[in-house]
A protein has these predicted regions:
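Hydrophobic membrane-insertion alpha-helices, especially the h-region
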Residues: 1-19
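Compact recognition or signaling/catalytic modules
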Residues: 1-2, 12, 31-36, 41
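Generic ordered-secondary-structure signal
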Residues: 3, 26, 83-87
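Residue-level detector of functional hotspots within protein domains
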Residues: 6, 27, 50
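Aliphatic-rich helix starts adjacent to a transmembrane/signal segment
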Residues: 20-35
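N-terminal alpha-helical signal peptides/signal-anchor transmembrane segments
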Residues: 34-55
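Low-complexity, acidic interaction segments enriched in glycine
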Residues: 53-209
Length: 209
């Protein structure tokens, strides 16, 4: 009987310790894994902006991969300053460029060379950091927005990684609780993971910010 009581005490003690350590470890693991994913989602948003500058819309994941493979982006090479004296003389910036007073040239360069660093491939860029078997989600849509008296359709995007991708190997009860808590945010419309952007409004920030 004494042995059984001792074993029971050990088991109870172990469970009590684990009830504290498991949530703590879950939280530490979540924070550590989310940090590089947050950085990557911001990088994806930067690439989406470059795509939008060229095409005036956003790209789903496969099209963004193709854009990074053989697409081009542009920048304006500037020489000379458009001065107050030019403005006061009634010369706008386009006229100043035509007169040779300033230079404004559009230069096209490789999207891959311009946007990807360190020799990273488009395929690697779109993988979830730490989980190369999973691809970052990218969804696109259009939302109505009032501009003056007009209503125009504005392109939007959301890039995201679910909790179930980067915490699949953690305690399932804690994971399911985290998913439910995330979904309950924003009046029940929260995303169960990390997400940047929105499909319902013009937004370019992450849900962790």
């Amino acid at each position: 009987m004494t042995v059984l009581l001792l074993i029971a005490a050990v088991v109870v003690g172990y469970l009590a310790v684990m009830s504290i350590l498991t949530p703590e470890q879950f939280s530490k693991t979540r924070i550590a894994r989310e940090a590089p994913i947050q950085v990557r989602l911001k990088e994806v948003a930067h690439v989406e902006k470059a795509f939008h500058d060229v095409y005036n819309r956003y790209a789903p994941v496969e099209e963004l991969r193709q854009f990074l493979t053989d697409g081009r982006v542009f920048y304006v090479r500037s020489e000379g300053d458009y001065t107050d004296a030019m403005r006061e003389a009634g010369i706008n910036e386009r006229e100043a460029a035509a007169k040779g007073l300033i230079t404004r040239d559009t230069v096209w360069v490789s999207a891959r060379d311009s946007l990807l660093k360190g020799g990273m491939t488009p395929e690697e860029f779109l993988q979830v950091p730490g989980f190369p078997q999973s691809i970052i989600e990218i969804d696109t849509a259009s939302v109505a927005q009032e501009i003056g008296e007009d209503v125009v359709m504005v392109p939007v995007f959301r890039t995201a990684v679910p909790l179930s991708v980067y915490l699949a190997d953690q305690d399932h009860k804690l994971l399911n609780t985290a998913i439910r808590d995330a979904e309950a945010r924003y009046q029940g419309t929260g995303y169960p993971g990390l997400a940047l952007g929105s499909l319902k409004e013009v937004k370019n920030t992450g849900n962790w910010e």
